[in-house]
Amino acid sequence: MIVFDHVSKVYPNGTVGLDDVNLTVGDGEFVAIIGRSGAGKSTLLRAVNRMHRITAGTLTVNGTDVSTLSGKALRQFRRGIGMVFQSFNLVTRTTVIKNVLSACVPDMPFWRVLLGAFRREDKLKALESLDKVSILDKAYMRADQLSGGQQQRVALARTLTQSPRIILADEPVAALDPVTAKQVMQDFVHINQEMGISI
């Protein structure tokens, strides 16, 4: 559950990003925030995983006051929250599966990261995530050979591989054509309904 209780965010230059926001998102809910450009939608999302610090109020996620987290506790907290952005943030000159496996890197010993030695269970989980977004057949293709919609699905599969309880999607279909955008949104709905992940 995500609870904004009188949350405000004022940037150092004086710009108000959020002004006394009260909002509760229950476990497993699918919520869309709609508003004009500059209304604070991205600020609201980024406050949830503490990419932005709030300046007033209380923000709790699954009972944890986000503003109290730092260091290792903050990194661990963020592992439970997946982010999907408008830009896909893929390494386009490598394979789809390697992009998805990058979700496992924070939990790996340094030597495994250095050698690219992913565990069998990590590989199986990555393949399972690709299957959930209907692009398992693209696993060993280079990411730059995929369409925009397919690349966004790779980003979503990468997020699923980290086993999040919450997925925050910041304009995930803004760069896609209407037909592809609808397909990607259907993937989000399917994941929400089948896996109970809050989106």
Each language-model region and where it sits:
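Helix-to-loop junction immediately C-terminal to a conserved catalytic motif
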Residues: 49
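Helix N-cap at the start of a conserved alpha-helix in ABC-type nucleotide-binding domains
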Residues: 178-180
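Catalytic Walker B motif of ABC-type/P-loop ATPase nucleotide-binding domains
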Residues: 167-170
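Conserved ABC ATPase signature
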Residues: 142-146, 150
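ABC ATPase NBD coupling module
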Residues: 66-82, 112-120
